Amino acid sequence: AMTTALVGAYMNIPVAHLCGGDRVIGNVDDQVRHAVTKLSHLHLVTNRESFERILRLGEQPFRIFDVGNPGLDRLLEVPVIDAVKLSQRLGFTIVEGEPLVILIQHVISTEIDQAYEQMKISLDAVSELGIKTILSYPNSDAGGQQMIRANHEYDSLPFLYVAKNIPRLEFVNLMRRASCLLGNSSAGILE
């Protein structure tokens, strides 16, 4: 997004920015998002707070449109698959009606040195609960390898399914069945 916005600004090509004004505390994403906002011409925000935040950045109100999050519309397009088929696709048994936790935790870019310990705290909680848990790898930000190292210390738990990547069809269907989303991912908020 940053490169596109820079090129658009230098080439005098109008740029529309989606999700400007959204917040991620403790992550470099805020700085990048605000920079892209300042380089963009149209702002398609997901909520009223983001609208107000962009106004405070000095953008003109007629250039800001509260359109909501298009990711929500895309969720409706994802077909529902039953627990048996989902289990087959994952290679991990999901039982309809049983509690299910999804753990997605990413490194806080201002706390990279604490990534391993933070992941262990979440994994200790999951271990104590003993509930079926889907654990997704963190993103590729700095510190992610420390989190993955912590993940490996728990991957022998029989109720834990560790996935490097979960395809969208399976992920959305897991979220439909989840009793709890644990961690600091925006997936549960945005989707």
Stretches found by the model and what they are:
Residues 2, 18, 43, 168-191:
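A donor-sugar binding/catalytic signature common to diverse glycosyltransferases
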Residues 1-61:
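Active-site and donor-binding regions of nucleotide-sugar-utilizing enzymes
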Residues 81-179:
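Donor-nucleotide binding loops and adjacent catalytic segments primarily
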Residues 20-24, 69-70, 187:
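Short, acidic/turn-prone active-site loops that include or flank metal/cofactor-
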Residues 40-115:
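A nucleotide-sugar donor-handling region in carbohydrate enzymes
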Residues 3, 53, 74, 112, ...:
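Phosphate- and divalent-cation-binding pockets in alpha/beta enzyme and binding domains
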Residues 6, 33-34, 124, 172-173, ...:
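Alpha-helical segments flanking ligand/cofactor-binding loops in enzyme cores
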Residues 39-42, 62, 160, 178-180:
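Short active-site oxyanion
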